[in-house]
Regions:
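Gly/Ser/Thr/Pro-rich low-complexity, intrinsically disordered segments
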Residues: 6-7, 17, 22-65, 72-79, ...
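Positively charged n-region of N-terminal signal peptides that target proteins for export
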Residues: 1-4
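Repetitive helical segments and hydrophobic/amphipathic motifs
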Residues: 11-12
Length: 477
């Protein structure tokens, strides 16, 4: 239609050159690409980004006539500019830790709307500047929000949201009074041989009010970390690492666990390679009833069933584990030390978790340590944790102990648009913020999960629940 008009206008102009009677003036909008010369013009949108604020600048040809409103729980900033036009088709791309999107729209020929979708209800200031004319939007990058509520007497829950120059962070925090709630370590399926289990089902099977994932584990469900449950060893590691001990006086203690296991038979000492884990080449593995009813081993080893300090059976594979006994499973060179052992021989099994935690009835092996006596104390290097745990931001699960003995269970989402995750140091700082004086790290990544009253509170980074090897649960006393 515009082309037809231009063609007709050209003809009129040509005729106008022949006769003044037919002369015509070119409209303002044709001379300015569709914008009236009487209108204010938005010619450019540009950004300025610092550690403390994001600045959005609209370059104008005249002073702005504008209005501002907030929508979507104050996370959306809407700026309407009146008696203005623009040739801009869209706002320039913006990579920001605080803004999701910027949308530029027009209404009719004289209204322009700019929508700024923020990740949180950030503080924003909108103002004008002259010489040259500009409309400026300053968005402060620091925002923090806590949404606390009491679940029941002795149990409080807080959803924590923070946005700053690092990005958006979302965490879920439970604070439990141990005089009203029991904290327990429970296995997936109640045995290691059962394999892994999703946390929601694990919590339900124990009638738990709340639960978080526990320590590290292998794909078969065996635990990676020095772990004891109700006096029996559940899993071990070669590394000396921070563990949580349930002490005889009822207190919780964070300290270094050091597993040492030895079998004494016929005057010889044979050191254990591990407990309740797959038997490898030349290994000596101890199985107890925490593992399950049977060892599940293959026929390439020899197994000695022990009850009340004596060998009661010698098998080749998949031995039955007595309720009050153990099975010593050996392979390769380890078999040489047991070559002369026969049924009825006395055998001694010694286990120790180190001077600080050996008296604990239950030990949760994980790490590293994060807080000690109210101060940041991250021991990832000393405890020889690999880079996927020690470095970078990730989803995290952590436990803290307050000065009054209350416990903090914390899950932090990561690797998602609503939450960047935390480093170990940032995890320690967040525990500290919620009042913990001592704290340590549990398994994280896709395992990080919190269940409260049968509902998953966080957003696991796998997109759904990852089956885990163990969980820490809260039950009412």
């Amino acid at each position: 239609m515009k082309r037809l008009f231009i063609g007709c206008l050209t003809l009129l102009l040509m005729l106008g050159n022949m006769s003044p009677t037919w002369a015509a003036k070119v409209p303002d909008w044709l001379q300015t690409g569709g914008i009236s010369t009487s209108q204010n013009v938005l010619s450019n949108i540009r950004y300025g980004d610092t550690n403390t604020r994001l600045r959005i600048v609209l370059d104008l040809s005249a002073a702005a006539n504008y209005s501002v409103s907030r929508e979507n729980n104050d996370t959306r900033l809407v700026v309407n500019l009146n008696n203005i036009a623009t040739t801009l088709q869209e706002a320039p791309d913006l990579r920001s830790n605080v803004v999701k999107d910027i949308i530029l729209g027009t209404y009719g020929s004289d209204t322009v709307q700019l929508i700024v979708d923020m990740k949180a209800p950030m503080e924003a200031k909108v103002y004008t500047m002259a010489n040259p004319h500009r409309l400026v939007i300053d968005i402060q990058k620091e925002y923090e929000e806590m949404q606390p509520r009491q679940i029941m007497p002795g149990l409080n829950y807080t959803r924590y949201l923070r946005v700053d120059n690092r990005g958006m962070l979302t965490a879920y925090v439970l604070e439990a009074d141990r005089s009203k709630f029991d904290l327990q370590l429970v296995l997936a399926g109640d045995s290691i041989a059962s394999g892994r289990q999703k946390l929601k089902a694990l919590a339900s099977s124990h009638q738990a009010v709340a639960a978080v994932n526990g320590g590290y584990f292998a794909l078969d469900g065996s635990l990676i970390g020095n772990t004891r449950i109700n006096g029996q060893t559940a899993g071990t590691t070669y590394f000396d690492r921070t563990s949580l001990g349930f002490m005889p006086d009822g207190t919780l203690k964070l300290a270094t666990s050091q597993y040492y296991g030895v079998v004494e038979i016929a005057g010889q000492k044979v050191y254990l390679s591990g407990v309740n884990c797959p038997r490898g080449e030349n290994n000596t593995i101890l199985y107890n009833r925490v593992f399950g009813n049977y060892t599940g081993t293959n026929e390439f080893g020899t197994e000695y069933v022990v009850q009340k300090g004596k060998v009661i059976a010698i098998n080749q594979a998949n031995s039955f584990i007595p309720v009050d006994g153990q099975v010593i499973s050996v392979h390769g060179k380890a078999q040489e030390a047991f070559a002369k052992v026969k049924i009825g021989d006395k055998i001694s099994i010694g286990e120790n978790f180190g001077p600080e935690l050996d008296s604990a009835s239950t030990i949760v092996g994980a790490g590293p340590e994060l807080l000690r006596n109210g101060q940041l104390h991250v021991t990832a290097l000393q405890e020889q944790f690999p880079a996927d745990i020690a470095k970078g931001r990730a989803p995290r699960t952590a436990l803290g102990i307050k000065a009054d003995g209350k416990i903090i269970l914390m899950v932090i989402d990561g690797r998602q648009s609503h939450s960047i995750g935390t480093t170990l140091t940032e995890t320690a700082q967040l525990l500290q913020k919620f009042g913990a004086v001592n704290g340590f790290n549990l398994d994280g990544g896709g395992s990080s999960e919190m269940v409260l009253q049968g509902q998953i509170l966080n957003s696991p980074s796998d997109g759904g629940e990852r089956p885990v090897g163990s969980g820490l649960i809260l039950t009412r006393r």
